[in-house]
């Protein structure tokens, strides 16, 4: 099992953020993901850390499809793949109407079709082919004008891995069909089939197996002999996910928890959050949900969670280590890595792994 982290910037402390990645690379972390919502973009920070690292893979986790043309996504991917000497991973997601329409002023429509066509055009461009495409959302060149089918002036970069952050059944099937990896959220190993069944259906449609995808999920990591102390601070974040990451009509994260059997909780927390009762919303998040979506407690308890992810079929554990300082975060990360390696040693001598 591989380990991934996220590049997170507190305020404007870019030096601290980049040093975290440099040290994580030294410890053996496999990849780092840079995200975007309505703050910093996902791309620029990766260029910053690419110049300071040599081995760790660098991924956009995620670029919001629809905020950039497919050609610009391809140009960005080829630039980062070139400057990082092949370490770049292109992570894409559709975001949601509140961000796409509210922040970018772009209509949130046909998200699955838009994503599929974006990937088609990106792969066409990165292979060095002329951009000629006729889809339901995109058509290149644009008809009725003076545009020509262009070939990228950059050197071809075929085979850039594409990861999709998807949650709905239809988008999960598309991920299994056309992507190289999946960036999961709202995930609990005990309910992995809520996602994996759809990923597998898409993979089968493309004549391949789920084992050909890198499945990346995980959560917050914190060590303590008093696990009860670690639970309450995680509840506001889950309440935010259930209540604020979308509208009442469109919240893909909330829908995922409902499909996993937490419909009553998801609806109640969402209702309270949208009514402005955020503390009440957080208080309704059950301890069980916190423990299932994170890796908390003693080393033995965290190891059990690692094993649960492994048995479910997860190939890369994406984690956020606890710590108020750089040193504290790295200490947590180092303990986690040691447990992952110890777990992998046990697998090597015969411990079972779930079929994917």
Describe the predicted segments one by one:
Residues 46-57, 77-87, 176, 207-210, ...:
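Acidic (Asp/Glu)-rich catalytic clusters
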Residues 1-60, 66, 160, 350-355:
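N-terminal beta1-alpha1-beta2 module of alpha/beta enzyme domains
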Residues 3-7, 32-34, 58-61, 88-92, ...:
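Hydrophobic faces of well-ordered beta-strands that scaffold small-molecule active sites
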Residues 3-15, 63-70, 156-167, 221-222, ...:
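Active-site mouth loops of central-metabolism enzymes
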Residues 109-153, 193-311, 345-356:
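An alpha-helical appendage that flanks or caps ligand/catalytic pockets
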Residues 40-47, 188-203, 327-331:
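Active-site-adjacent beta->alpha loops and helix N-cap segments on the catalytic face
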Residues 12-24, 76, 166-174, 234, ...:
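Short, acidic/polar
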Residues 29, 85, 179-180, 314:
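A structural motif
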